Amino acid sequence: MNYRLIATDIDGTLLDDEGNLPANTYQAAAYLEEKGIRLVLCTGRPLLGVLKIYDDLKLTSPVVTNNGAMVYLSKNGPLIHNETMSIDDALHVIALNDIFNCTICMWHNNILYVSQLNKYAYDYAGITGVTPLLLDQIDLRKCDNGPTKFVFTDTLEKITSIRETAAKLSPSSVTAVTTRPYFLEFFSSSISKATALSKISEALGIKREQIISVGDGFNDIDMLDYAGFAVAAGNSHDEVKKHADMIACSNNEGVIAYIVENLIKK
């Protein structure tokens, strides 16, 4: 198959457990660039949390951020897809935290708002590279559009214990899914990485069967199902692996290099 695009999740897939790029990923990315195969970052992160990785790998490809809510044809744009939650749904999600008492992180117009400035907020902000503002500084009722997404963060034990209940209590138009074991994300159910890839396919004239998707998390499943060929990182949850055509090495060993050696060069 003449593959033209590899769509990869970042955390738990592209990056190792320490949040770094495995050494063999740089050479693999350079090989893909030389062959004209787009390496597309598809992540729950906002654009600002992607730029260093994008630049380190010397990419020129489109970028999918916020679980598919925003799609850029390159790091400098243009923005070809942008979808947000409704304000009513957003207010409902905020109210859920009266039950769960987690730290809320909310993205609105590429600004990060947090319910309190504590360890959890600063840890999340550190990953994204954005300085957070307090949530009480914005009144969603007076905004023209809703937020892109929410992240509830706390201990692994708490997030694990509330995940299913939070999903049941969320509006039907909102998806609640863990993107890291200690991050529970809420976003519009019409948002998906698969939808984002379809926008890129249309813009670049790339067919689904020419796309490889790779991920490790539950929020990657729709992307794996969309692509012509699906790869799960070796560290993926067993349920995610059921959606894969190939099980690669773990994220610590360089998943993209594994795909290049075992699929692209074959």
Locate each region found by the language model:
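Active-site phosphate-binding/coordination module
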Residues: E18-A121
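Conserved acidic, metal-coordinating active-site core of Asp-based
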Residues: L96, F100-V214, F218-D222, N235
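Asp-based phosphoryl-transfer active-site loop
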Residues: N2-E18
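Short, structured coil segments at secondary-structure junctions
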Residues: L57-L59, N66-N67, K75, L169-S172, ...
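Short active-site oxyanion
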Residues: G36-V40, T60-S61, T148-K149, E209-Q210, ...
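Mg2+-dependent phosphoryl-transfer enzymes with acidic/Ser/Thr/Gly-rich catalytic loops
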Residues: M1-L5, L21-P22, E185-K266
